């Protein structure tokens, strides 16, 4: 190759790298342009998503404000309805007071004549050991719900004849254990059972008719015939027992079929409320000697078992509380006074405030003039307004 040909090839060889460099720059520019386009799209999408999120947030806030207003409106309506219901209950109470229902006593003129004739011949059977207590219940002054503890049925009470502040609890309708709380405060605590002493009785108890009286626990045991067990709470021993002298016993309350004997205490002493097949429609009453457990006297009362849920004795007068199969307002609708001072048809009709269900036990405290009740697992105190029997 001649020299002149080499000189011609030199410009061509120098132009080749410049062409490749130009192509590379164009490629880079295209890639950068594509990247910028995608970044612009991302910015557009991000802006759109931010706008949609802001709109959604505003929409949710608006819905929450509307829901809050509706909730306030519903609460106001509920409060108004509750106020109307309370006013209606007060009006019903007033109407019931003005137009009381007839006592829950069957009236049979022939039977009344026979009873009157028999009463003239048997005046010596009128109970004459009563004290000068002449009070009866006028109304329920106040109700206090303590807490919810244990089973739907049970019993709680204080010592009816002592000054002790201890609380005694029978949980359920059949067991062998009694809970003892030192004071009301310990019982009302959330973890109440941790503060309670437990006594395991030598014989299991049945029903909710038991009683603490003068430092002794009187409870019902069923082993063939029913027995009344007298248990010393101080030394934890059985000091006496007695077979209850009634044949073919049946549940004493129609709405509380688990209780066959209801032990009660009042200003006069110890009582037993029961029922038998011989007089299966009505409730019977007996006066007990708390020392020997002997029966001092027995009565066939005019108070029906049907729809009865509980009973207690005040100043020698049996007060029976009635309800319905579908729990409603309990009421003392039959009163039987063993002294004859207060005829059943002249007793006040006493209504209890509406609660949760029905009473499984009602224990009257003569010292405090109040009733300790167990209502569907809730422990309730009813404070009673009293008046003289002659004022009824």
Swiss-Prot record:
First-listed, main subcellular location of the protein, grouped into a coarse class: secreted
Alphabetically ordered keywords of this record: Coiled coil, Developmental protein, Disulfide bond, Glycoprotein, Secreted, Signal
Coiled coil location: 25-99
Glycosylation sites noted in the Swiss-Prot or TrEMBL record: 175, 235
Cross-referenced InterPro entries: Olfac-like_dom, Olfactomedin-like_domain
All residue ranges annotated as the Olfactomedin-like domain in the record: 132-388
Biological process according to GO: signal transduction
Cellular location(s): Secreted
Disulfide bond positions: 133-315
Protein function: Secreted scaffold protein that plays an essential role in dorsoventral patterning during early development. Stabilizes axial formation by restricting chordin (CHRD) activity on the dorsal side. Acts by facilitating the association between the tolloid proteases and their substrate chordin (CHRD), leading to enhance chordin (CHRD) degradation.
UniProt name for this protein: Olfactomedin-like protein 3
Species of origin: Gallus gallus
Protein's gene: OLFML3
């Amino acid at each position: 190759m001649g020299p002149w040909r080499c000189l011609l090839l030199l410009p061509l060889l120098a132009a080749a790298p410049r062409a490749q460099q130009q192509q590379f720059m164009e490629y880079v520019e295209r890639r950068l342009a594509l990247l910028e386009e995608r970044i612009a799209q991302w910015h557009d999408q991000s802006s759109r998503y931010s706008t949609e999120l802001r709109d959604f947030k505003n929409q949710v806030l608006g819905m929450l404000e509307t829901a809050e207003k509706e909730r306030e409106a519903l609460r106001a309506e509920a409060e108004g309805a509750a106020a109307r219901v309370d006013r209606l209950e007060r009006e019903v109470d007033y109407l019931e007071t003005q137009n009381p229902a007839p006592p829950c006593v069957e009236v049979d003129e022939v039977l009344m004549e026979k009873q009157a004739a028999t009463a003239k011949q048997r005046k010596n059977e009128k109970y004459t050991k009563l004290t000068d207590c002449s009070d009866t219940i006028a109304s329920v002054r106040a109700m206090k719900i303590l807490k919810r503890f244990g089973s739907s049925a049970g019993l709680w009470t204080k010592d009816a004849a002592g000054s002790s502040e201890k609380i005694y609890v029978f949980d359920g309708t059949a067991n062998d254990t009694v809970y003892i709380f030192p004071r009301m405060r310990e019982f009302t605590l959330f973890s109440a059972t941790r503060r309670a002493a437990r006594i395991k009785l030598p014989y299991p108890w049945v029903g909710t008719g038991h009683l603490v009286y003068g430092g002794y626990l009187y409870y019902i045991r069923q082993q063939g015939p029913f027995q009344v067990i007298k248990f010393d709470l101080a030394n934890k021993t059985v000091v006496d027992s007695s077979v209850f002298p009634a044949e073919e016993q049946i549940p004493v309350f129609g709405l509380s079929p688990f209780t066959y004997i209801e032990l009660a205490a009042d200003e006069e002493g110890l009582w037993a409320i029961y029922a038998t097949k011989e007089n299966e429609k009505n409730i019977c009453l007996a006066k007990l000697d708390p020392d020997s457990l002997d029966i001092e006297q027995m009565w066939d009362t005019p108070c029906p078992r049907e729809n009865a849920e509980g009973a207690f004795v005040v100043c020698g007068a049996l007060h029976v509380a009635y309800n319905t199969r579908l729990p409603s307002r309990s009421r003392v609708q039959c009163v039987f006074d063993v002294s004859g001072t207060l005829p059943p048809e002249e007793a006040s009709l006493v209504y209890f405030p509406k609660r949760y269900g029905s009473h499984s036990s009602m224990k009257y405290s003569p010292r405090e003039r109040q009733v300790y009740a167990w209502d569907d697992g809730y422990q309730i105190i009813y404070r009673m307004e009293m008046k003289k029997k002659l004022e009824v």
